[in-house]
A protein has these predicted regions:
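Conserved phosphate-binding/catalytic region of the ribokinase-like
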Residues: 129, 133, 185-224
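Short, small-residue-biased leader/transition segments that mark boundaries at the very start
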Residues: 2-6
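Conserved N-terminal subdomain of the carbohydrate kinase-like
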Residues: 27, 31-112
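Short beta-strand/loop segments at the ligand-binding rim of alpha/beta enzyme cores
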Residues: 135-142
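Charged helix-capping and loop-helix junction motifs
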Residues: 121-127, 152-160, 183-189
Length: 224
């Protein structure tokens, strides 16, 4: 069947974070926009099942839900293609941001996929400003997907904006090299630490595990 050939998995980096936190017993909520279509309804049902609040979720009758097609090569490496012209997620406006949800949160998490186009770019910046004004910790995962950007300068601008705003940074080794130009991860972490006011830096290394920086200490953990 088509589903066997193309299995459907609700997801997206921020929702994956929310799902893990919800499973650990934390209260979570999602802010964003999806189409009032089969994919959008599936995403809402999944959030409800995961006990993730959908008070900040907007259903659009005008725009479709964005879909990502993931291809795995023989080494298990992923590549992405997107059906997103124009996706409902891009059309979230400043007025649709659930301000109370942000004000009542301890951590606000975001990535660059909500900064590729307007109006969601301005909506994201407004949400970050609300978090800052209310002393909410800001967590940032660049989650760089080249297919969604017109050029490298635009994504570097978005990543640097996130680096200037976040308290917690989760970044991949490839993204860290992309933004610093350094392939030595220790040096790249120190470069980021010295340039930005970030409290905790987490670097994923794929199958090789992860690194972290916290209170002037750099550590390493092997993969599971």
């Amino acid at each position: 069947s088509l589903h066997d050939a193309l299995p459907i998995y609700p997801g997206g980096a921020p929702c994956n974070v929310l799902s893990m936190l919800s499973n650990l017993g934390y209260k979570t909520g999602f802010i964003g926009k999806v189409g009032n279509d089969g994919f959008g309804k599936l995403l809402k049902e999944t959030l409800d099942k995961e006990n993730i609040s959908t008070d900040g979720l907007v259903l659009s009758d005008e725009y479709n839900t964005t879909a990502a097609f993931v291809h795995l090569d023989e080494n298990g490496e992923r590549s992405f293609s997107f059906y997103r012209n124009i996706g409902a997620d891009e059309m979230l406006t400043e007025d649709e941001i659930n301000e109370e949800m942000i004000k009542n949160s301890k951590i606000f998490h975001f990535g660059t996929l909500s900064m590729t186009n307007e109006p969601v770019k301005s909506a994201t910046k407004k949400a970050i400003d609300i978090a800052k004004e209310n002393n909410v910790l800001i967590s940032f995962d660049p989650n760089y997907r080249p297919a969604l950007w017109k050029n490298d300068n635009l994504v570097k601008e978005a990543i640097e904006y996130g680096l200037n705003k976040c308290d917690i940074l989760k970044i991949s080794d490839n993204e860290l090299e992309f933004i610093t130009g350094m392939n030595d991860m220790n040096e790249a972490i120190i470069e980021i630490k010295n340039k930005y006011d970030i409290k905790l830096i987490l670097v994923t290394l794929g199958e090789n595990g992860s690194m972290y920086w916290y209170k002037n200490c750099i550590g390493y953990r092997s993969g599971f």
